[in-house]
Amino acid sequence: MPMIETRTDRMLLNFGPHHPSMHGVLRLLVTLDGENIVDCEPVIGYLHRGMEKIAENRTVVQYLPYVSRWDYGAGMFNEAITVNAVEKLAGIPVPRRASYLRVIMLELTRITNHLLWFGPFLADLGAQTPFLYAMREREWILDLFEAVTGMRLINNNYFRVGGVAVDLPYGWTEKCLDFCEYFLPKVDEYERLVTDNPIFRRRLEGIGVISKQDAINWGLSGPMLRACGVNWDLRKVDHYECYDDFDWEVAVYPEGDCLARYRVRMKEMRESCKIVQQAVKALPGGPFENLEAKRMLEGPKSEWNKGDYQFISKKPSANFKIPKGEAYVRVESAKGELGIYIVGDDNVCPWRWKIRPPGFVNLQVLPQLIRGMKVADMIAILGSIDIIMGEVDR
């Protein structure tokens, strides 16, 4: 009687760099025993463009348009950390109004990032419709960006050393508040559709678990860290910009699995929306059209022309020199701790520009999370990390 030969050796499978669920040019060398994952080796570098070396051969003004290509899903965080590094090293003050404008833009960028994560993540799990809902809401924010900066997704080039490029256009604050009122019920709608769906929960609950101590040891940050029960958010820890002026909560869940990472991001969208509402309503000087009218009414010596009501303290010259010294500056981006280590030597270009991207650090834990899991679970785990290869490879 003929016998069916059973394959006993392990299979080496390539996922990516062109697989649609890799979310960029990421290649995973996966060792399989049947359907079970034995090992995984991420292969990176396909999107390396030498961003650190470019920074060391450009002035800050020249380099700013480049930085949107790190995390191209949330480009304004890259601009924020670029100008913050120079401001800290050179001791450049930022007007209060400019700080509020920065916070508004950063939190809107956080929402766009999470929407861009939410849609494809659900599509990876087999739910196609939420992707269309997420893009519908994201379009509102891109229209707001376009009204202020002229660009929609990347290359906003809005942040400047000492402030921002321009003030808000007429009527922008009203449209922004309209979006916030529209968006918060939509997040509730997403939750009703998705969160308690039994298929969705079975795909995520208890999958890709990492303990609190392991998350700290690996150096994880952002939603990856807060989903392990660690209450760590740089907006609260470092007190940068004007986040202390607003009432908001850090999203923390203790389970450490894919579902907890999903819930952290959903809550962060709500909290970001609340921060935007508070910042717009408390904007120093109010909407730009009102501020401009007050200045015209009271003349050149009006208090509304003073520093706190300006959108930039002083524009740096083209030959602005970065003073001698070193500094490490970080912001809480949508994916975690985005940091810059800068060394200046009293020259127009920095002597050293080291980028600390959150995605690069968070990706390191992937092999540990997927060993012993099924192939389908690997897609869910990778999606829950939220990887953008532009910042991983730099």
From Swiss-Prot:
Leading EC class: translocase
InterPro entries: NADH_Q_OxRdtase_suD, NADH_UbQ_OxRdtase_49kDa_CS, NDH1_su_D/H, NiFe-Hase_large
GO biological process, one term: photosynthesis, light reaction
Pfam families: Complex1_49kDa
Molecular-function GO terms, alphabetical: NAD binding; oxidoreductase activity, acting on NAD(P)H, quinone or similar compound as acceptor; quinone binding
Major location (coarse): membrane
Catalytic activity: a plastoquinone + NADH + (n+1) H(+)(in) = a plastoquinol + NAD(+) + n H(+)(out); a plastoquinone + NADPH + (n+1) H(+)(in) = a plastoquinol + NADP(+) + n H(+)(out)
Parts of the chain that traverse the membrane: none
Keyword Thylakoid set for record: yes
Subcellular location per the Swiss-Prot or TrEMBL entry: Cellular thylakoid membrane
Family in the record: Belongs to the complex I 49 kDa subunit family.
Record note on quaternary structure: NDH-1 can be composed of about 15 different subunits; different subcomplexes with different compositions have been identified which probably have different functions.
Record-given protein name: NAD(P)H-quinone oxidoreductase subunit H
The organism of origin for this protein: Synechococcus sp. (strain JA-3-3Ab) (Cyanobacteria bacterium Yellowstone A-Prime)
